[in-house]
Amino acid sequence: GLPVCGETCFGGTCNTPGCTCSYPICTRN
């Protein structure tokens, strides 16, 4: 939820392990 993973998820998925989509960016926890 807090740190940004340096990835966007406009497609709805995140490729970075441990990261989830908090549209439109990927976050970790």
UniProtKB/Swiss-Prot annotation:
<feature type="disulfide bond">
    <location>
        <begin position="5"/>
        <end position="19"/>
    </location>
</feature>
<keyword id="KW-0960">Knottin</keyword>
<keyword id="KW-1015">Disulfide bond</keyword>
<dbReference type="GO" id="GO:0006952">
    <property type="term" value="P:defense response"/>
</dbReference>
<keyword id="KW-0611">Plant defense</keyword>
<feature type="cross-link" description="Cyclopeptide (Gly-Asn)">
    <location>
        <begin position="1"/>
        <end position="29"/>
    </location>
</feature>
<feature type="disulfide bond">
    <location>
        <begin position="14"/>
        <end position="26"/>
    </location>
</feature>
<comment type="function">
    <text>Probably participates in a plant defense mechanism.</text>
</comment>
<feature type="disulfide bond">
    <location>
        <begin position="9"/>
        <end position="21"/>
    </location>
</feature>
<dbReference type="InterPro" id="IPR036146">
    <property type="entry name" value="Cyclotide_sf"/>
</dbReference>
<dbReference type="Pfam" id="PF03784">
    <property type="entry name" value="Cyclotide"/>
</dbReference>
<dbReference type="InterPro" id="IPR005535">
    <property type="entry name" value="Cyclotide"/>
</dbReference>
<comment type="similarity">
    <text>Belongs to the cyclotide family. Moebius subfamily.</text>
</comment>
<protein>
    <recommendedName>
        <fullName>Cyclotide vibi-B</fullName>
    </recommendedName>
</protein>
<dbReference type="InterPro" id="IPR012324">
    <property type="entry name" value="Cyclotide_moebius_CS"/>
</dbReference>
